[in-house]
């Protein structure tokens, strides 16, 4: 294909449609009928005529040679030459008059199709063996009934005719009849019945096989069937039956949609079978004389043999039973060809392997979609082992000469020819293969400005492929820069990497500008630097910047000296006047608020040497360098300078780090590790505490669960104390120059856990078990030995279990993490930045992430790079800090930190109104480069990769956090954050104890404006230490509560009376164990009930029956469920559960219980009250003259002054569980997750609405990652959750085209409601001929028609207002979201390929190629980045063709003018 043709075909593929082929279309595409089952003649080795490889049908095997040998290549070329001489320029196909073969290229054998004329119709297996059953849904037959009809076991009544009422027969349409029943009916009805025409309603017709199904399908009126099903659904009361009817309804709708676009329903019955081109089912000759054949040839042969045999049997009028058996066999043969895996007994080869059918070649990892269309192998690539290249620059890699010579071969040949070193291509190739020295100089020249791409498998995120400037090296291993290892997740223990060469100018330009390693310093997952020194480099930098003081034994050279500049220090160090660790004074420039200021500071020589390579703009960095501080420094330098400066800085610190790690000689020995003396006493004390806990349990003072938990906590605390002792000893040893401590403290290697196991104790171990039950995952007796002492046999045996489980888990989770990433990518691959601003008025509220009031992630780090939704004000003076629609960046983030703002409302992908993709403003900053996101960025794929990439770091099991008991007290009180005045809100108090459910305390500033500085919810039962309108100071305690138990407090003085109470055998406590509505009552002296309390299950009663109590006494304690165990069921299983939006089976249904009010610590005035009515709806405003539609999402639009004051909201978590307080809207109930037992997502969705459910989902997912120390920006989760929540379920369809129970895209739903909004529904058409009953008509047209009818004295049309559809939001799992995407190509290449393709075909779907996958499949440029449709990138890279032509024209005109002047 020429370049011109390629360009045309490339840009023409804008959409692709799929429909069912009719027999006429199959014949039109076919080049001839295949009659014989033979393939190749064993004597001549040539294809058999009219066989499966026939040259007449499919084209010649050799170029321009026919079957009989009349036309050879030379002869054909001569004929063509003669024809061209006769000016017959259009040389059409030339056919051999002997054998009928067209004289053409053999490539036609890849495209030409044949066909088989089937003797009897055959049903396509996808039509009756898929779920839901397509043919069964149309005809109302079950799968078993269909099977009996198709495989010739039963007759089906097509038309009962006279048999319906004749001679006591009661036969209905679609009744199944056995052979005996059929014969009986034929004998009963008159003999003349068979002579009637088929269209005669009195004729009895019953048939079997595909033939009868074809007739039944032709007779079906889909529109009538649709309305019948709708009526049936309306009247149906059984839920199960309704679900089945909905499934049928959906299938019928698909067929109706397809029919409108030209599909024929009867085309699902095959009369002509297409045969694919022979080159796609090859027959390859083997060395031994045999042939290796594609499985498809076997299938086609079976079909042809059976088809021919059936034809012959019909011709000789064989008995019906034999014919029926042959027809069934033919049906089975076609079934096997189309989908062998769907058959109960799959056709197998001689080696008992199921043969690969047409469907199998599309499905799965080895199928056409994933193997050949989405995962192509590429030319110009190489692969080799990687070794470290410490002398390389960040953008360079070392490329072995052999690899370079091979992949740059075409460029090398061109240069050799241009320089006239060789004359022909062949001789150039010889020169290269000889490795002539001359080629290396040319290669060096070629490498300049022509980068290579390096890729390490598995490519989990976009940094798995980066481009480098190659340098020629000797040897066979690729040199890799050590700083890019973390991005590739590479190490030098035998890892291999692939090299790819970008060929076109556009590809080279993109590799240079976008993919160069020095451009990819930041991690797209979180925006932090990923190109950070590690291991040796960190250790070297830590060592050089550590200070060492002189002691009596050893003096440090140069300590206390003063220097005027950094250079002076360097000279002194080079001349060995000062030592690297010496503490000195030096005049440096320090960065302060005003700018760079000169100061004399106390520092070390090593820090001065480090600062020589630091960019001057940044100022002097006087820090001990560790892994964490280096990350912050690199980040700061990157945002305050530029990428080239940062890349140079990274290279310099890499060299410094390696040099000083080598100079320091930082190895370690056994003496660097020692066991603390306090170990014995700590262990002894722990054993005593454990025995005391056991005694308490035996006495019945605590429950078994509490005993277990306390023992685990004792050992955990002991372990922590011991670890601290070990690390303190190391810290003091050699002034902190203990090698092991330096490795730990710098973050170069090791962790506190490993140090603890070396010289403390191994600690608690996991219990060997298959399933993890709550609170029994850990062995109570820890391993008391450490690795220095050595383990006993029992201890060793216990510890081996964990080690082995770890290895098994790693293997399992790698596959799980890969599958999770694939599902995420598929669900979000079409999310691309499409527009600048969607102009939404909605956003989300963000506050700091807290764990028990301890800040885990600050507000500033969470809102960095986001766009402010409204103006952000300073709470103290109401000054605007950040304007609406402004990005929150490093420059203005300090303002937020100083102003002590708790919550900020920002734009979010969750609330973006863009119909396709997301807008720039709602996304904010591109985390990969720190700039505002650009149009065309494929943020869906980036989000999926960012979430999936750390998947392998997550565990597969439940693990114990431990140490919970000691920490809880700190988080069971509220302190004042500022000085101010206390204000009560809905608080009822009995003896300083809160007895109201929705209590709140506000802290106001002591000014006239009374700005709210802090707002906290107060739990029921909390003890108050302040009164209303009281002045408090910062850090004063406002209230406290029991962190272990929720309580119920007596509101009156009186006597206790209760029923349905049981005693705990062990503890003697009264415990509620069954729901017999147990109640506790307070009665007065007259036995009148003052107050009655319902008691929740699991509650402990503190009072006895008949006790006299005072108001404010505690009656009941309800142990908080989460305290039973400090275990986190985390890792991949939990993540998968959340992304698939699965509901837990054991969700506690507190909403339905009578005890719910005891748990409700929510704020009644929260932002989500409106979500109780969570339906999307339209309101038709009759007074609205403009006929504008008003669609209401039921969001709380709040335009009073408070809505702009983001500071006035505060979050508070009274729960003592380990959940993070991850705030998406601090006024919501779910800012604190104060719920006993997990509430399912669907319950939150139903009760609190979509935003609360989205927030809860993101909260839960982030908790899994945070528990493992993985940082991922919220934006990525928001993009995925947006994809999961972009659809609604139709509750009432009204007058729209929707079906109740259908799932629709939100924008489609809103568009449909908008379309019908100004229309009217005709109830009676009157005398109008223009309109009919049930029609939706524009009001103006209706008015006009009624006016005309009135003039003619005719009956007017009666109409009513339209009823719009009502829907509710739903959450779909990522698998479902990926399968139900708008693109059928994308869905088919993900999962359930055959189902997706068949459903697309019957409804004649069109794929508009908006996503990435569908364009990759078709070989188009992906519509992202530089390939974005309607983008300006084309002009930037390729240039505007018209401008070039204009330039050429102007140049030609200039030349002509000059020539004319010369002539004159």
UniProtKB/Swiss-Prot annotation:
Obligatory cofactor(s): Mg(2+); Zn(2+)
EC number of this enzyme: 2.7.7.6
Signal peptide: none
Reaction(s) the record says it catalyses: RNA(n) + a ribonucleoside 5'-triphosphate = RNA(n+1) + diphosphate
Residues annotated for Mg(2+) binding in this entry: 491, 493, 495
InterPro entries per UniProt: DNA-dir_RpoC_beta_prime, DNA-dir_RpoC_beta_prime_bact, RNA_pol_asu, RNA_pol_N, RNA_pol_Rpb1_1, RNA_pol_Rpb1_3, RNA_pol_Rpb1_3_sf, RNA_pol_Rpb1_4
Cofactor note: Binds 1 Mg(2+) ion per subunit. Binds 2 Zn(2+) ions per subunit.
Protein name, UniProt field: DNA-directed RNA polymerase subunit beta'
Species of origin: Karelsulcia muelleri (strain GWSS) (Sulcia muelleri)
Encoding gene, per UniProt annotation: rpoC
């Amino acid at each position: 294909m020429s370049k011109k043709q390629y360009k045309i075909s490339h840009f023409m593929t804008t959409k692709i449609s799929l429909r069912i082929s009719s027999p006429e279309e199959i014949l039109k595409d076919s080049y001839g009928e295949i009659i014989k089952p033979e393939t190749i003649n064993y004597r001549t080795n040539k294809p058999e005529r009219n066989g499966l490889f026939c040259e007449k049908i499919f084209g010649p095997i050799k170029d321009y040679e026919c079957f009989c040998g009349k036309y050879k290549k030379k002869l054909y070329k001569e004929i063509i030459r003669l024809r061209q001489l006769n000016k017959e320029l259009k040389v059409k196909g030339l056919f051999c008059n002997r054998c009928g073969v067209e004289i053409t290229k053999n490539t036609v054998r890849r495209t030409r199709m044949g066909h088989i004329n089937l003797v009897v119709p055959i049903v396509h297996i996808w039509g009756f063996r898929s779920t839901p059953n397509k043919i069964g849904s149309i005809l109302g037959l079950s799968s078993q009934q269909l099977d009996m009809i198709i495989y010739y076991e039963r007759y089906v009544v097509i038309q009962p005719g006279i048999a319906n009422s004749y001679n006591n027969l009661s036969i209905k349409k679609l009744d199944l009849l056995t052979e005996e029943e059929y014969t009986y009916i034929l004998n009963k009805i008159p003999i003349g019945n068979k002579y009637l025409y088929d269209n005669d309603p009195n004729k009895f017709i019953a048939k079997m096989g595909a033939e009868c199904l074809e007739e039944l399908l032709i007779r079906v009126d889909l529109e009538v069937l649709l309305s019948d099903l709708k009526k049936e659904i309306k009247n149906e009361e059984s839920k199960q039956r309704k679900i089945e009817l909905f499934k049928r309804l959906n299938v019928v709708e698909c067929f109706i949609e397809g029919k409108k676009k030209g599909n024929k329903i009867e085309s699902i019955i095959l009369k002509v079978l297409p045969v694919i081109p022979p080159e796609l089912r090859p027959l390859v000759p083997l060395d031994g004389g045999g042939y290796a054949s594609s499985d498809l040839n076997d299938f086609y042969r079976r079909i042809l043999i059976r088809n021919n045999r059936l034809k012959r049997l019909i011709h000789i009028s064989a008995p019906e039973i034999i014919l029926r058996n042959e027809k069934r066999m033919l049906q089975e043969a076609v079934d096997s060809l189309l989908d062998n895996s769907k058959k109960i007994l799959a056709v197998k080869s001689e080696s008992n392997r199921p043969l690969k059918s047409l469907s199998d070649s599309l499905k799965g990892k080895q199928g056409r979609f994933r193997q050949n269309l989405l995962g192509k192998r590429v030319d110009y690539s190489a692969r080799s082992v990687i070794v470290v290249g410490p002398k390389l620059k960040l953008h360079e890699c070392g490329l072995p000469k052999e690899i370079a010579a091979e992949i740059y071969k075409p460029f090398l040949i061109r240069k050799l020819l241009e320089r006239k070193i060789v004359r022909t291509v062949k001789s150039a190739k010889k020169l290269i293969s000889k490795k002539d020295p001359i080629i290396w100089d040319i290669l060096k020249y070629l490498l300049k400005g022509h980068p290579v791409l390096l890729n390490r498998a598995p490519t989990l995120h976009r940094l798995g492929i980066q481009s480098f400037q190659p340098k020629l090296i000797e040897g066979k291993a690729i040199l890799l820069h050590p700083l890019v290892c973390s991005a590739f997740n590479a190490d030098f223990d035998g890892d291999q990497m692939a090299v790819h060469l970008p060929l076109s100018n556009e590809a080279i330009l993109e590799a240079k500008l976008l993919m160069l390693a020095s451009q990819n310093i930041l991690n797209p997952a979180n925006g932090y630097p990923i190109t950070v020194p590690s291991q040796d480099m960190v250790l070297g930098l830590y060592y050089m910047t550590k200070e060492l003081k002189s002691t009596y034994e050893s003096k440090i050279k140069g300590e206390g000296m003063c220097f005027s500049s950094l250079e002076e220090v360097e000279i002194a160090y080079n001349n060995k006047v000062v030592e690297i660790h010496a503490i000195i004074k030096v005049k440096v420039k320090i960065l302060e608020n005003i700018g760079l200021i000169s100061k004399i500071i106390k520092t070390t020589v090593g820090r001065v040497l480090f600062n020589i390579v630091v960019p001057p703009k940044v100022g002097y960095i006087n820090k001990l360098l560790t892994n964490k501080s280096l990350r912050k420094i690199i980040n700061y330098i990157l945002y305050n300078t530029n990428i080239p400066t940062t890349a140079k800085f990274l290279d310099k610190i890499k060299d410094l780090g390696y040099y000083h790690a080598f100079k320091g000689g930082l190895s370690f020995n056994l003496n660097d590790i020692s066991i603390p003396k306090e170990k014995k006493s700590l262990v002894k004390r722990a054993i005593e505490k454990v025995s005391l806990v056991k005694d308490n349990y035996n006495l019945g003072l605590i429950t078994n669960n509490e005993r277990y938990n306390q023992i685990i906590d004792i050992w955990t605390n002991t372990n922590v104390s011991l670890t601290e002792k070990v690390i303190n000893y190391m810290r003091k040893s050699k002034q902190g120059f203990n090698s092991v401590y330096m490795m730990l403290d710098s973050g170069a290697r090791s962790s506190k856990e490993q140090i603890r196991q070396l010289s403390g104790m191994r600690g608690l171990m996991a219990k060997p078990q298959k399933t993890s039950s709550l609170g029994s995952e850990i062995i109570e007796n820890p391993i008391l030995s450490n690795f220095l002492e050595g383990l006993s046999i029992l201890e060793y045996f216990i510890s081996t279990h964990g080690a082995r489980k770890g290895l098994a888990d790693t293997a399992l989770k790698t596959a799980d993490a890969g599958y999770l990433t694939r599902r995420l990518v598929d669900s979000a691959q079409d999310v691309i930045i499409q527009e600048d601003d969607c102009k939404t008025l909605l956003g989300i509220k963000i506050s700091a992430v807290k764990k028990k009031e301890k800040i885990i992630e600050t507000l500033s780090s969470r809102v960095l790079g986001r766009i402010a939704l409204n103006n952000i004000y300073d709470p103290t003076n109401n000054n605007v800090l950040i304007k609406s629609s402004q990005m929150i960046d490093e420059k203005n983030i300090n303002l937020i930190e100083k102003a002590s703002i708790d919550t900020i409302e920002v734009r979010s992908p969750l609330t973006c109104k863009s119909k396709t993709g997301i807008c720039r403003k709602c996304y904010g900053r591109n985390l990969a480069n720190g700039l505002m996101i650009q149009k065309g960025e494929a943020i869906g794929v980036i989000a999926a990769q960012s979430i999936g990439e750390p998947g392998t770091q997550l565990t597969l099991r439940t693990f114990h956090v431990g140490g919970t008991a000691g920490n809880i007290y700190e988080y069971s009180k509220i302190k004042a954050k500022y000085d101010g005045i206390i204000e009560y809100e809905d608080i009822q108090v009995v003896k300083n104890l809160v007895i109201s459910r929705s209590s709140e305390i506000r802290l106001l500033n002591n000014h006239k404006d009374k700005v709210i500085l802090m707002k906290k919810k107060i739990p029921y039962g909390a003890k108050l230490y302040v009164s209303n309108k009281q002045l408090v100071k910062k850090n004063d305690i406002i209230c406290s509560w029991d962190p272990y138990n929720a309580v119920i407090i007596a509101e009156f003085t009186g006597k206790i009376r209760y029923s349905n109470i049981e005693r705990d055998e062990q503890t003697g406590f009264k415990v509620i164990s069954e729901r017999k509505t147990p109640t506790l009552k307070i009665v007065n002296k007259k036995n009148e009930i003052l107050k009655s309390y319902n008691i929740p299950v699991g509650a402990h009663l503190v009072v006895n029956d008949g006790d006299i109590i005072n108001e404010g006494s505690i009656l009941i304690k309800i142990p908080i469920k989460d305290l039973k165990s400090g275990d986190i069921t985390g890792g991949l299983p939990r993540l998968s559960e959340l992304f698939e939006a699965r509901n837990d089976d054991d969700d506690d249904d507190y909403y339905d219980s009578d005890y719910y009010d005891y748990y409700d610590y929510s704020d009644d005035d929260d932002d989500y009250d409106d979500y109780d009515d969570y339906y999307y709806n339209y309101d038709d405003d009759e007074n609205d003259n403009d006929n504008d539609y008003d669609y209401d999402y039921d969001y709380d639009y709040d335009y009073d002054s408070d809505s702009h004051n983001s500071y006035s909201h505060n979050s508070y978590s009274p729960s003592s569980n380990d959940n993070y307080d991850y705030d998406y809207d601090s006024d919501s109930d779910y800012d604190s997750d104060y719920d006993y037992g997990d509430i399912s997502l669907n319950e939150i969705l139903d009760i609190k609405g979509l935003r609360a459910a989205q927030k809860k989902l993101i909260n839960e997912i982030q908790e899994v990652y945070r528990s493992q120390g993985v940082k991922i920006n919220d934006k990525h989760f928001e993009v995925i959750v947006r994809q999961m929540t972009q659809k609604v379920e139709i509750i009432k369809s009204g007058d729209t085209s929707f079906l109740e129970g259908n799932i629709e895209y939100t924008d489609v739903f809103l568009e449909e409601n908008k379309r019908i909004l100004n229309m009217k529904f005709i109830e009676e058409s009157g005398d109008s001929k223009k309109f009919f009953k049930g029609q939706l008509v524009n009001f103006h047209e209706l008015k006009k028609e009624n006016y005309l009818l009135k003039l003619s004295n005719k009956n007017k049309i009666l109409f009513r207002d339209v009823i719009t559809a009502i829907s509710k939001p739903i959450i779909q799992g990522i698998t479902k979201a990926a399968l139900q995407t708008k693109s059928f190509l994308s869905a088919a290449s993900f999962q359930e390929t055959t189902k997706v393709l068949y459903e697309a075909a019957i409804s004649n779907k069109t794929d508009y190629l908006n996503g990435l996958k569908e364009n990759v499949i078709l070989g188009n440029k992906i519509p992202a980045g530089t390939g974005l449709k309607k983008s300006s990138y084309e002009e930037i890279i390729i240039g505007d063709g018209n401008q070039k032509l204009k330039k050429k024209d102007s140049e030609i005109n200039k030349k002509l003018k000059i020539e004319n002047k010369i002539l004159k």
